Amino acid sequence: MIKNRKEDLPIVILKENVLFPNITLWVTFDNEYVINSIAQSMLEERLILFAYSNEPNCDESDRGVVKNLCSVGTYSKLIQVIKISKDVIKVLVECQSRVLIDSVSKKNDYLRAKVTFVPDSSGLNRELFTYSKFLKETYEAYRNSLSLKSYDADNEPINYFENPSKLVDIIASNSNLENSIKLELLQELNVKTRIEKLIVNLSIEIDLLDLKKDINSKVRAKLDKGQRDYFLSEQVKEIQKRLGKDENDYIDRLNSKDIPEDVKSKIEKEISRLSKMQMNSPDANIIRSYIELILDLPWNENTVMKNHLSEIEFILRNSHYGMDEAKEKIINFLAVYQINSKVKAPILCLVGPPGIGKTSLVESIARSLSREFVKISLGGLRDEAEIRGHRRTYVGSLPGVFISAMKRSGKSNPVILLDEIDKINSSYKGNPESALLEVLDPEQNYKFIDHYLEIPYDLSNVLFVTTANSLNGMSKPLLDRMEIIKVEGYSYIEKLEIAKIFLIPSIIKESFLDKVYIRIEDDVIFNLIRNYTMESGVRGLKRVLTNLIRRLVRELLYEYSKDQIIKGNFYSPSSLIHGNNSLFTHDPDIPGIYKIININNYYNYVDTEDNLDLIKIDSSGFVYGLAWTNYGGTVLPVEATKFEKKGDIILTGSLGAIMKESAQLAYSIVKTYSSKLNFDVKESPEIHLHFPEGATPKDGPSAGITIATAIASILSDKKVPLDLAMTGEVTLKGFVLPVGGIKEKVLAAYRNGISKVILPKDNKKDYSKLPEEVKDNIDVKFVSSLEEVFDYLNII
């Protein structure tokens, strides 16, 4: 070591440990100043000084701490740093030598010190050899007094017998001496004096340990059997007292909650049972979990409605586009709720195709009411115990989804979404739909009993909202408990507005393009809606727009750096406003990054258009029908051909029983027009009807007039216009009956470029609810009989 060598390095002040040179060990730190010093050391050469204060209650942030530092510190090197948590680190330290602290200064949020290295004699002369030998013997006696049979092989004192300085440091580090004594040994620079002090202190410790052993042996010898029993009894009481800490906590929590008296009495009995059990008993763990669940549940802890009715209405109407009927029913209920807070909430069921925002609407409802929101997915649920919970006698039993949801919400009046209630399945484990009847009945759910709880729990303050794609197959008792709100798909204009107001801004924000000026023209969005998505909702549109923005990001990264895109102040927010013909308009005088996507360049950012065009066959016997599915409306082509031989009707295309009956019925009706269609009923030709997309099951009565028209068209050899579609059920006498799903069906026709639609006359009221945009672009013919259809198409 170079004599009088000096260095400037970060400093850490230790309060509880004394680190001796020649030792490698792990040290844990949780102090901000210490962590900052270690971080600075890692940025330099990993060297650091461990210093010690004469005042045990010193604080690194105290300016006067410098004056109280010991003159000698430990010069060390950081080998490894592990982050345990946000404010805790674990450091592997190699302590190397003693140094004298010349000065300490504060740098921002850590301390630095200037130090001078002091030579530490490691030579072995006869005198030091004798001292070292005596120290080793004293240390062996000290270990025997502690009943230590082995110690760390790496720090074995005998390994450093020829280096007295290392020997004394390692023995001092391995001993249980007080920190004040260890600090005195660290400060001592003379090796001989250091050994003398350590021998004296170890000898004192040996005497104290031997005296303690002697006293204990004499006391134990005097304890008779009765005294030993009393001693053991007191130990058991102390253990039980310590274990009873949980019991006291449970009692305090129980008294702090507004729990019904019968429930409180039951829990007190469970707590009493728990206190008499062994801590690790399986039954004790079951009871403990049960008690904690009861205490974690909200009991009469309601969220107060903070917003006024007008504010709630504003939030609902501005946070979600469309679904006016659902919003109206919620607002009507809240109007009554503000007058009478004990009114029972309705059970709403939003029915509609996927991707139209049913789930996000429920989230908006919870937000407007300032209530907690919890979602329960019921799709694929087939075990009744998932609803009612498992009885506690079963291993691994758990409460049902509703009790778990209440625990997660932490409030007694959350908004709970029951998603995809139509996809619940029955199994040998029971019918979950039957279990839902109690939950969704306002007359019963105030005392809902979960099998795990075994006590009534009040769900009457919960606002339940369910969603479904279809009501087909759902039990009538369950439907009877809910207010059904049918939510239809969106028109082009509605999708355009949703894209401009919600989708594009959210995608831009998620892509960190807030500081980039992006304009996507309306023509581009319209083209994406028409040619890339044929859906009732907007999920497909969001995917297309997301892919467009991603390609835009890739293009930007070729031209600009990441920091320019994310952090650059490219425009003033006031320069962006909503325009009529584009998403945003921009002041050209403001500098920045511009990306304008118009009808001429948008194809650079999207995939090749999918072939979504309808099948078009310009011949007689080909007609478009309109159908409703769980995913919205669709256009259903129907093909008919005839054979000269006499026969009946042949049906293909994966048809259900109702649709097959409709086809038989339609052919019978058409036969009544045999004279006008120029064929002999007695020689009725064989007709083959085919419905394309044969892998897709089709059923329902609404294709009646479509099938009849296709048969009449092939028999009369007259074509039906390819820009026309129809829907309606027919009777044996030729009357046209109303059908459901009019909005979805007409929207499907509009999406597919159909300009004329034939509808039952009794569906006028449904047609009137369609957006003006759709009604302005489609000509509708309302009919009450099949003859009107044939006359309109000039078939007869």
UniProtKB/Swiss-Prot annotation:
Q: Which BP terms in the Gene Ontology apply to this protein?
A: protein catabolic process; proteolysis
Q: Which UniProt keywords apply?
A: ATP-binding, Cytoplasm, Hydrolase, Nucleotide-binding, Protease, Serine protease, Stress response
Domain Lon proteolytic: where?
617-796
The answer to whether keyword Cytoplasm applies is yes
Entry's induction text:
By heat shock.
Q: Does the keyword DNA-binding apply?
A: no
Where's the active site on this chain? S702, K745
Enzyme Commission code: 3.4.21.53
Which residues are in the Lon N-terminal domain?
9-206
Task: Tell me which PROSITE patterns the record gives.
Answer: LON_N, LON_PROTEOLYTIC, LON_SER
Example GO molecular function term?
Answer: ATP-dependent peptidase activity
* Its job: ATP-dependent serine protease that mediates the selective degradation of mutant and abnormal proteins as well as certain short-lived regulatory proteins. Required for cellular homeostasis and for survival from DNA damage and developmental changes induced by stress. Degrades polypeptides processively to yield small peptide fragments that are 5 to 10 amino acids long. Binds to DNA in a double-stranded, site-specific manner.
Belongs to which family?
Belongs to the peptidase S16 family.
| Quaternary structure note | Homohexamer. Organized in a ring with a central cavity.
Which NCBIfam families does the UniProt record give?
Answer: lon (TIGR00763)
- Name the record gives this protein: Lon protease 2
Organism, scientific name:
Borreliella burgdorferi (strain ATCC 35210 / DSM 4680 / CIP 102532 / B31)
